[in-house]
Amino acid sequence: GLELSHISEGESPQETLSKPSAQQGLIRFCGDVARQRPEGGCWLDALADWRQPLVLMVAGEAGGGVAGAAAAYAALCHQLGAPLIGLVQIGSQWNRLQRRRDGLPWMGWIPAAGVPERELALDHLVQVLSRRSITAAATGVGAHRP
């Protein structure tokens, strides 16, 4: 498996992303990737520059909806050239029709513990993530741009 690093928005993007563990593993970012840093730029700028593949985790709302921030962050990734692999809905109900209509690159959902579809949904998510990761690697995602 890959090493999982935990970082927060207060850490230096350049220092963190230049570490071998960040280049070869997964990063769980806690905070707002679009928040402007005092020295300029934001984490999302750095992730785009380093071609770090991204998966956005989005909280599900009652009834299976998601906040508009999901579309806003996906658009910002596109604008900055950040390699967005896809979005994953956390919790609530999975509304396949709504997810198709919003046109975002959804990978699936992670149902709450105890939900009957949990194992099937997680298996599907692993398959989609694997396929998209292979595609990302083949297109040079993860290679730092100077």
Residue map of PLM features:
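Charged phosphate-binding loop/patch that engages nucleotide di/tri-phosphates or the phosphate backbone
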Residues: Q127-P146
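Charged, low-complexity, helix/coiled-coil-prone segments
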Residues: Q14-G25, A67-A74, R145-P146
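Switch II (G3) loop of P-loop NTPases
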Residues: L4-P13, K19-G40
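Conserved catalytic-core segment of NTP-binding enzymes
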Residues: F29-R131
